[in-house]
Amino acid sequence: TRETRCSLDFIAKYSKKMSQRNITGTQAAAYLLKVNGITDVKLGRIKGNLTDHFSPSEKVLRLSDSTFDSTSIAAIGVAAHETGHAIQHAKKYFPLTFRNMLVPVANIGSSAGPWLAILGIAMSFPILTDIGILLFAGSVAFYVITLPVEFNASNRARKILEQNNILSAEELKGVKKVLSAAA
């Protein structure tokens, strides 16, 4: 979509702009975890581009190849966004907890739900139709809940980057665009 292209354009643009303080995405994430009192989350690397994520079950914040060693404004923004998820987890942010509980339902519901509903209709078996619809509704709920969780992580990232003077005022303008794209 047009919005996705625009988001990726911002990330690409700010991936070419290096931070004045020459801090890598990994260094930014480590520092932000530390100043937020989060000592039980490990940092790891994951192959790919924009494959960054926080795994609450493993307590690992994984940064992609394009973020890990990069000193770009985009890398710092993406790393801070993922750190925002670690902060959400540490503070027991309910929408994140609820979303994580929906992951198994969303995985099953998005793939099996529609098929069960169709099969239930075809076989005149209403309970199967209802189960399919409920499973699919669970996957829809997951995606609806994901948006506020992502926006909250980006808002947390913006605030902690500002509070800790990791980026200059000019760089913060760019990182805000990256964080909107990350959400």
Task: Describe each region flagged by the PLM.
Residues 102-125:
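Post-HExxH zinc-binding segment in Zn-dependent metallohydrolases
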